[in-house]
A protein has these predicted regions:
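Stable alpha-helical elements in mature extracytoplasmic
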Residues: 4-11, 37-40, 104-105, 134, ...
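Alpha/beta-hydrolase active-site loop
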Residues: 2-23, 31
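Alpha/beta-hydrolase-fold serine-hydrolase catalytic core, especially in secreted/extracellular enzymes
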Residues: 113-115, 123-173
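Short beta-strand immediately N-terminal to the catalytic nucleophile in serine-hydrolase-like folds
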Residues: 31-33, 58
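Short glycine-enriched nucleophile-adjacent loop
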Residues: 38-49
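Surface-exposed acidic, glycine-flexible loop patches that form ligand/cofactor-binding
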Residues: 18-24, 77-82
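Soluble non-cytosolic domains of exported or imported proteins
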Residues: 2-6, 35, 99, 129-132
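The feature captures the conserved acid-bearing segment of alpha/beta-hydrolase catalytic domains
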Residues: 53-139
Length: 173
């Protein structure tokens, strides 16, 4: 959408100014979505890959799912926008497990082999609860994303350069 990047940048700049944390102008983002809004983080990453550290879809959907939450077709997906090299984690509870939710993610990985989507079954959990172990796993996922994607020692006053991961080199959470 026209002007969206400028609106996002203004929002982050305003937040940096109001909060006193100037680094908010440039830090990488980890979009998180749950349930029907769990396609949001995939779409954010495709729209702004240089700013996306990692993606978390919690008890939600795959990128470009045919189920609820995806919304209208984003014609730019696959042409000018993708999530190649950005680590993504799709988490489903054991008691909400549904192949119709996983199959679009597997198909996406086949269509976009440079995407780095991993899956986690939240054992013993349903749609609205999360185990402490799952929270620990998400924290580990984010630590590893920082470790492998940050290049050098980023300055607080300039955009962070993120390395693109290659799934052929072993990236799966």
């Amino acid at each position: 959408t026209k002007g969206t990047q400028e609106i996002f940048n203004r929002m982050m700049n305003d937040l940096a100014e109001v909060s006193g944390y100037s680094e908010l102008e440039h830090i990488p983002v980890v979009p998180v979505g749950h349930s029907a809004m769990a396609t949001y983080p995939w779409n954010f990453a495709a729209w702004n890959p240089k700013r996306t550290l990692a993606v978390i879809s919690l008890h939600g959907d795959a990128p470009r799912t045919n189920l609820c939450g995806y919304g209208g077709e984003n014609l730019e997906w696959g042409r000018t926008r993708n999530i190649d090299g950005i680590p993504g984690l799709m988490i489903e509870g054991e008691y909400e497990w549904w192949e119709a939710r996983v199959n679009p993610a597997l198909a996406f990985r086949m269509m976009y082999p440079e995407s780095c989507i991993s899956f986690l079954c939240d054992t013993g959990r349903g749609h609205f609860d999360v185990a402490g172990q799952t929270a620990d796993y998400i924290a580990l996922f984010l630590r590893k994303a920082l470790e492998y994607r940050l290049s050098g020692h980023p300055s607080l006053n300039e955009p962070v350069r993120l390395k693109k991961l290659n799934p052929k080199e072993g990236w799966l959470a």
